[in-house]
Each structure stands twice: as C-alpha cells, then as structure tokens.
Amino acid sequence: MDVFLMIRRHKTTIFTDAKESSTVFELKRIVEGILKRPPDEQRLYKDDQLLDDGKTLGECGFTSQTARPQAPATVGLAFRADDTFEALCIEPFSSPPELPDVMKPQDSGSSANEQAVQ
C-alpha cells in the first residue's frame, strides 16, 4: 500500500508518496533527487525519533491508515553541517489572512442569488 508523506525541514516541505515496504534509505534517495543532498548527509525523524535506514516505512509506523493522501504523515529532515548534524527544526506554517467581508458567508436564511428550481 502507498503511504503519503510530508517531509519538512525549516520552511521547506516536500509532499511525496512511497510504498509501506520502502526502506528509510529509499526515502532518502527520493529526497536526494529533489534537494541534491546524498543520503549520508540526511537524517529523517518521526516525532523526534531518528529513523533507521534499514527499516521499512511500515515498520516505522507509516501505514496507509496513518499516512493518507488527505492527511499525510510528517517526517522531519535534518542535514549534516560539517562534522555534525543540525538540530531538527521545522518552521510552523503561516496563518492565512482573514477573509474579506465579501467572501464571508451570509447569515440570512436565503440569498438574493438563489433561484427557485422548477
């Protein structure tokens, strides 16, 4: 089965899918293809827990029930900086601006734009 993932680092977000049977290392290869950083310079995390390269995504807890297209699972990403890895840092998403008044729903029972269907 496919799992749907949101790989996040600082303000970067990658949406991808993979098989439950794919290994963490194979997921790092996907990241390498996008961000041009080799797997040995990457660390992937689930809930602040470092993921083992040899484990499958299913063994790490990513299943088709927990990582769905409409609600992808979050994977943290950290890169190697010189001899050590940077701390895991994921910036929160920004809040959208408030809707303009013309786009807010009207409280009236019927709208002037509604027409009777005959």
From Swiss-Prot:
CDD domains according to UniProt: Ubl_ElonginB (cd01788)
GO terms, biological process: positive regulation of proteasomal ubiquitin-dependent protein catabolic process; protein ubiquitination; protein-containing complex assembly; target-directed miRNA degradation; transcription elongation by RNA polymerase II; transcription initiation at RNA polymerase II promoter
SMART domains per UniProt: UBQ
Modification sites for N-acetylmethionine: 1
Keywords: Acetylation, Host-virus interaction, Nucleus, Phosphoprotein, Transcription, Transcription regulation, Ubl conjugation pathway
Domain Ubiquitin-like: 1-66
Compositionally biased residues, Polar residues: 107-118
Superkingdom classification of source: Eukaryota
Intracellular or extracellular location(s): Nucleus
Pathway the protein takes part in: Protein modification; protein ubiquitination
Pfam families documented for this protein: ubiquitin (PF00240)
GO terms, molecular function: transcription corepressor binding; ubiquitin protein ligase binding
PANTHER family per the UniProt record, alphabetical: ELONGIN B (PTHR13248:SF4), TRANSCRIPTION ELONGATION FACTOR B POLYPEPTIDE 2 (PTHR13248)
Name of the protein described by the UniProt record: Elongin-B
Naturally occurring in which organism (per UniProt): Homo sapiens (Human)
